[in-house]
Amino acid sequence: MRPAALRGALLGCLCLALLCLGGADKRLRDNHEWKKLIMVQHWPETVCEKIQNDCRDPPDYWTIHGLWPDKSEGCNRSWPFNLEEIKDLLPEMRAYWPDVIHSFPNRSRFWKHEWEKHGTCAAQVDALNSQKKYFGRSLELYRELDLNSVLLKLGIKPSINYYQVADFKDALARVYGVIPKIQCLPPSQDEEVQTIGQIELCLTKQDQQLQNCTEPGEQPSPKQEVWLANGAAESRGLRVCEDGPVFYPPPKKTKH
């Protein structure tokens, strides 16, 4: 092959390779694009009910499940969780972001899971671009939203009597001014009604201001993720609550 032809062939191969890399890079970016954050809090008593595991004496207040970018996860697998970076936050983390379903000593595994799956994607935002910022901002939002106090002030507290799903929806919308998303555990064969399990409040990407979780025409995700580890088996998954009665279970064990 003549030198000119060889150079042309090499240039063509190089251009093709660059096009392929560019396409792959765009697909990667598209896979990790997200538009809003979701502050997810769960009711520990229900979490323990849906997971067949060694859940013991769960907290009797709503705790953090996570701060999730929508439609994006696992954005940077080369950015490992480092407990040292959040050591100043540990007292609050243990109280308000506990791993309620496992009794193993290394409870930081739950935080590791949340960072690697969700935090590495949230880091696209300057206010969340480190582990300390991500977990610290999550704790700030937990305090600011104050879901536990809001429900109590509205007269919604754990009870053996059933509520209506609309009681939760209307009360939260009235206080926060936005449409939340509420997930329930479907009834088992020996249960009459669904059980409330998780409440999502959605936030704008850049400044973390409240916004509707669903807009007209938008379909909510039917099933929510569950934190599993050490071979734990999920018995039932959370679903968006159906309109109708709902059980808000009181803690089974009285704490002293």
Curated annotation (Swiss-Prot):
Listed name of the protein: Ribonuclease T2
Q: Return the EC number.
A: 4.6.1.19
What does UniProt give as the signal peptide span? 1-24
Q: Which Gene3D superfamilies match?
A: Ribonuclease T2-like
Supply the PANTHER family for this chain: RIBONUCLEASE T2
Instruction: Name the species this protein comes from.
Output: Homo sapiens (Human)
Q: What the protein does?
A: Ribonuclease that plays an essential role in innate immune response by recognizing and degrading RNAs from microbial pathogens that are subsequently sensed by TLR8. Cleaves preferentially single-stranded RNA molecules between purine and uridine residues, which critically contributes to the supply of catabolic uridine and the generation of purine-2',3'-cyclophosphate-terminated oligoribonucleotides. In turn, RNase T2 degradation products promote the RNA-dependent activation of TLR8.
Q: Which cysteines are joined by disulfide bonds?
A: C48-C55, C75-C121, C184-C241, C202-C213
| Tissues in which the protein is found | Ubiquitous. Higher expression levels observed in the temporal lobe and fetal brain.
Entry keyword set: Disease variant, Disulfide bond, Endonuclease, Endoplasmic reticulum, Glycoprotein, Hydrolase, Immunity, Innate immunity, Lyase, Lysosome, Mitochondrion, Nuclease, Secreted, Signal
How its function is modulated: the record gives: Inhibited by Zn(2+) and Cu(2+).
Its GO biological process annotations read: innate immune response; RNA catabolic process
Q: Cross-referenced InterPro entries, in alphabetical order?
A: Ribonuclease_T2_eukaryotic, RNase_T2-like, RNase_T2-like_sf, RNase_T2_His_AS_1, RNase_T2_His_AS_2
Q: Name one GO cellular component term.
A: lysosomal lumen
Q: What is the effect of changing C184R?
A: In LCWM; the loss of a disulfide bond may affect protein folding and stability; the protein is retained in the endoplasmic reticulum and the mitochondria while lysosomal localization is disrupted
